[in-house]
Amino acid sequence: MVLANVYDSQCQERLEIVPYQGEEIPFAVQRPIWPDFYPFIIIFSLTLHFNNVSIINNMGFFSIFSREKKETLNQGLEKTKQSFFGKLSRALVGKSSVDDEVLDNLEEILVTSDVGVDTTLEIIQRIEQRVARDKYVTTTELNHVLRDEIVGLLTESGAQDEQEFAIPSGKKPYVVMVVGVNGVGKTTTIGKLAYQFKKAGLKVYLGAADTFRAAAVEQLCIWGERVGVPVIKQNMGSDPASVAFDTLASALANDADVVLIDTAGRLHNKKGLMDELSKIKRVMQKQIPDAPHEVLLVLDGSTGQNAFEQARQFTAATEVTGMAITKLDGSAKGGVVIGVSHQFKIPVRYIGLGEGMEDLQPFDRKEFVDSLFSEQV
């Protein structure tokens, strides 16, 4: 039996001793807590309680976030909107109806807006069917038709108008494993989620399971101290699965609502990644049999087509159930939200629209499309 010392986010107050029992996982005895800016596999656990009354049946997972962020959404998508509709307006000059030339131009615009080839062809095919059915579609109506088809694609991928990702009763803690490569903003995403969860009255734990990089652990600890939540860590080189085990054990022992575990996001090779994620899942299940309840993939929206390749590699390595797409405010590549969600049939859960704590928003398909097409339809 190995004993793990667990400390608060200041790495001072000892909270408990957690016995580890199960398959052999080498790790150090002393494990203070720290944080990281390049999170890779995060694990959250969540149950909503207010005044000691569970409200999970009346309140979705994403409902705890403020919905008064329309202005932030509009500003964050401004570059994408200007680029896309600027190209579209130029392509429609002198045209009164949608014909083959208009559709060819639209196809090129969608591809260059990082919607992706497969998704673009699907959109064009649907518009062609609409034109054939209605016999005549004006260029003015094209924006409305295009908007409807994008909403339809996001709907088919599981995106919601109201984020109704309800937490089942008895799932405390609710466990989410978040995966992604280095540098996509995973640690920032973890920190902002921790902040918003805590602000909503939830008890949050972080686990620094990226044991391959000292900077990762330190950066996660910065977020833990900034937000005021405990962070569980081990020494460099320890097994990430053992950090996940310790974090869930501490979360259970201390009645936590949310646990975010940050682990390495190295795309070394498909088999290595798959083995690592599988082991983390297997070890977590020694604490919580049905963990993880969600696997969240974090992608950098500003990388455009690279986001598709990252999604391809992670979906091949593990089951991904949701995505967070960050850094949408810094580029005109917002089309990646539509394309990657449609191509991999995975709903977008969050979008990052700035550096502020409140700028990580739960994704709402209707608000997203309304903002993208605002002042255009």
How does the language model describe each region?
Residues 6-8, 21:
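Alpha-helix boundary/capping motif
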Residues 47, 53-86:
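N-terminal accessory targeting/assembly segments
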Residues 74, 78-209, 216-236, 244-252, ...:
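Primarily NTPase-proximal linker/entry elements flanking Walker-type ATP/GTP-binding cores
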Residues 219, 236-254, 268-377:
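Conserved catalytic-core segment of NTP-binding enzymes
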